[in-house]
Amino acid sequence: RVGDALLTPGWTTYRHRIQYQTYDVTDLLRNGENALGALLGDGWYRGHLGFQRQRNMYGDRLALLLQLQIRYADGRTELVTSDSNWKASNRGPIRMNDLYWGEEYDARLEKEGWDQAGFNDADWQAVRKLDHAKSIVVAQVAPNVVRHEEIRPQRIFQSPNGQTILDFGQNMVGWVRLKVSGPAGATVTLTHAEV
């Protein structure tokens, strides 16, 4: 994971402005071969948005624009950029994601080492380079959304219909982290609510 920013990039009017973020990845680089990988989600661009909860308000295709600038000890620099030589897969464990409607995650589809050098991507598809107006690509100016604290449930109980309820004792913005075990194909459903 690069950085501590969450839900990036933030909302913007994508037809007029696309914000980029910068990160120092020096501590993540290793001697020998390295790999760059990214997970893309629907976010504000393609997810449900607005009072009508319309999808694809700005477009229906996800895209990644990436540039890695390497400065060697001897002063040389090298650029690694996302281009049509990259590959992508939509067969990973995240089956659906939406800022309002949550995420469907199928652990049976996890790809061990997908973000490591030497991963066999033979069954991945080639990506297509998209043209865009470079004038609308700007640095992010707003502060990042970051985690501020971890809150534990104040009460865990069963509802009359057998659902497990975690009461955090306050309104909050966030998500639940949990460990589960069970047979392959078992389903766990988390629903967040303000009660």
Residue ranges and their predicted role:
Residues 1-195:
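Extracellular/oxidizing-compartment recognition motifs
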